[in-house]
Design a protein with these regions (language model features):
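Flexible cytoplasmic inter-helical loops of multi-pass small-molecule transporters
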Residues: 96-113
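Alpha-helical transmembrane segments and their lipid-water interface positions
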Residues: 49, 53-65, 87-90, 131, ...
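Hydrophobic/aromatic residues within the transmembrane alpha-helices of Major Facilitator Superfamily
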Residues: 18, 22, 55-59, 92, ...
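Selective transmembrane alpha-helices of multi-pass membrane proteins
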Residues: 71-100, 167-171, 181-213
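Kinked, hydrophobic transmembrane alpha-helices enriched for aromatic residues
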Residues: 126-139, 199-206
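Anionic-ligand binding region
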Residues: 108-121, 127, 138
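Juxtamembrane transmembrane-helix termini in multi-pass membrane transport proteins
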Residues: 2-77, 136-156, 161, 175-179
């Protein structure tokens, strides 16, 4: 099939994809917090939302829209600051309401599965670093002169989503084991809220002040 890269390229891409997917970021912090807040269903709902966001980025990149965004300083900055503001909003919610880790029996994960899904979706849609990932990382595994370059680009985008979903699903499954222990220690949960807020704030600052693209 012409849209499939060579086995060597696929192996190199898979190895890089696993390392990238396992690197902590705002989305992984969100998966953990939603899992501890409402159990696996909320963790997987947030994961589904984040993967939907990656799918949107994949389509945009395959159509060339991501390259246009990356080339436009104003558009890039607009998305960058919108993403930073959203991360700060999540940090504020964790500090003000304990929304990051409100356990079952105390109101669930705050807003139900739909909210967990939407939060995961927005955390990836408003991250311009993902745009740059798709326009700088994926092309390294594709020959620009290949007649099937667009199809291979789309295939690798889907492959990265599959890798990310698998890695983070395993992390969510492991995190779910700590739910019972967390319920027995409300103070630890509050400290996790503080940690979550700190992480979101740090990611927001890094995103807003990153400057270079």
């Amino acid at each position: 099939m012409t849209f499939l890269p060579s086995p060597a390229v696929l192996l190199a891409f898979a190895a890089a994809g696993v390392l990238l997917a396992a690197t902590p970021g705002p989305d992984m912090a969100l998966f953990l917090s939603r899992t501890l807040a409402g159990g696996r269903p909320h963790g997987f709902a947030a994961l589904a939302g984040a993967m939907t966001g990656l799918l949107v980025h994949t389509f945009a990149a395959a159509l060339g829209l991501s390259a246009l965004l990356a080339a436009s300083a104003r558009a890039y900055d607009a998305v960058k600051f919108a993403g930073a503001l959203y991360l700060l909003y999540l940090a504020y919610g964790a500090l003000r309401h304990g929304a990051a880790l409100r356990l079952e029996g105390q109101g669930g994960a705050g807003g139900g599965l739909a909210r967990s899904y939407l939060t995961g979706l927005l955390i990836n849609l408003t991250n311009p670093k993902i745009v740059l990932f798709f326009v700088t990382f994926l092309p390294q595994f594709i020959d620009v002169g290949d007649a099937a370059a667009a199809q291979k680009f789309f295939f690798l985008g889907l492959a990265f989503i599959a890798i990310g979903a698998s890695v983070n699903a395993a992390i969510i499954a492991l995190a779910a084991r700590f739910v019972a222990a967390a319920k027995a220690n409300p103070k630890a949960i509050r400290w996790f809220d503080y940690g979550f807020a700190g992480l979101m704030g740090a990611f927001a600052a890094r995103l807003a002040l990153g400057g270079g693209r």
